[in-house]
Amino acid sequence: MGKGQMFTTELVLASAIFIAAIVIFVSIWNSMLTSYFEEQRDREMQVALNGISNMLVLSPGSPTNWEAGVLGNANAFGLASSPNVISHAKFAALQNLNSSYLSMKEKLGAGRFDLFMSLNNSTNTLYRFGLMGDSNDSSVKILRGSRLALLNDSVVTLNVQVWRTKGREA
């Protein structure tokens, strides 16, 4: 064989190494991209959870007497009669809107995520709203938050759960 000539086996080996390197690179890239998007959705869920729990216990909603009017016209569904004091009438009105869950979760700020909330005293659950995520399902990602507040001069806990199915674009 003369100078500068190449065997077919060398060409095949070089091509195989090159293709293997590309496959490895693409696999690593896809894995990193998937992780990035999962983390991004987790951050969005955390922002939604914080916003919802703050709005519910700190804001009366918009308009402030939304529970007395046409509920579909309300822009925001805060539950507070004053900061950290929950109105019984507002939570009862919100609970009655469970049949309008999809539009309500949008107005509450959950966006593309699902939402569940409950108001509990020391012994039982007083009110519930939304769809509870299945914590036994490994494909369900759930973020939870709890806020203390007053209801009729008693301490209650508002539990908020924002959840989504992992890997599914919500």
Please place each PLM-identified region on the residue numbering:
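N-terminal single-pass transmembrane signal-anchor helix
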Residues: M1-W29
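Long, compositionally biased, intrinsically disordered regions
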Residues: V23-A170
